[in-house]
From Swiss-Prot:
Name of the protein this chain belongs to: Response regulator GtcR
GO terms of molecular function: phosphorelay response regulator activity; transcription cis-regulatory region binding
DNA-binding region of this protein: 133-233
CDD domains, per database record: REC_OmpR, trans_reg_C
Lineage of source species: Bacteria, Bacillati, Bacillota, Bacilli, Bacillales
Amino acid sequence: MSKTILIADDEPEIIELLKLFLERESYRIIEAYDGEQAWNYIRQHPVDLAIIDIMMPALDGFQLIKRLTNEYKLPVIILSAKNRDSDKILGLGLGADDFISKPFNPLEAVARIQAQLRRAFEFNEPEEKAISTQSTTVGRLTLLHTACVVYRGDETYSVTPLEYRLLNTFMQCSRTSIFTKQQLFEQAWSETYWEDDNTIMVQISRLRDKIEDQPRQPVYIKTVRGLGYKFASKDDFDEEKT
C-alpha cells in the first residue's frame, strides 16, 4: 500500500519539487503551508511520515514537532535553511528523526525519506524482527520487545523505534562492550556513519531522560571518554544485592 507523506513548508516551490520526486516513487503527498494546517490534517487523517520546515507561519516547525512527538509515533524529518548546529540539536532533541538542510539534493532527500519509512515499518513486522525473548532486563530496567516500551521499576515509558533500536543494541551486549559512536550509529540507524556526533549525543540524552533516575549521573548509559559509550552489565546490579 502506498505510504502517505505530509510536507509542511511555506514555500510552494519546495513542496512541488519534493512532490515531483516522491510521486515518482508512488507516495501519496499531502501539502500544508503552515504548522496549524499540518497539525489539523494529522489529527484527522493517518500520515506515515512528516517533512517539516522550521520557519512557518501560525505554528512554527519546532512547536509542531513537539506536538507530534508527544501524541503520535511517526517519522519526522526537518527540512530547513536554518542549519546551525543549535537548530539541528533542538529539532532532534524535540523528537525529529533526521535533518535535511536547504538547499538540498532531491534524490538524497528521497533516499533519506525511504530509509525512515523502512525503519518505521520494518520495526512493526515481527517476521522481520524475530526476537528470542519477550523482554530484556538489566537492573531495574526492562525493555519490552513486543512494543516500544521500557519499564524502569514501576514506571513505564514509551520509546520511539530509533530509541528502541539504540537501547536494544546496548542491552544485548551489555557485559563488557564499549561502543564507538560509529558502531552505535551503524547499528541503530542502519546507515554509514557520517561523523555527525550531535545526532548520537541528542539521542543518548533523550534515552537517559527516560531510563536514568539522574540523567546527569547515569547508571546505565555511561560515557567512556575518548572511546564512546558503555552500558551497565547485569553483574553490576547483582553485586549491589550482595
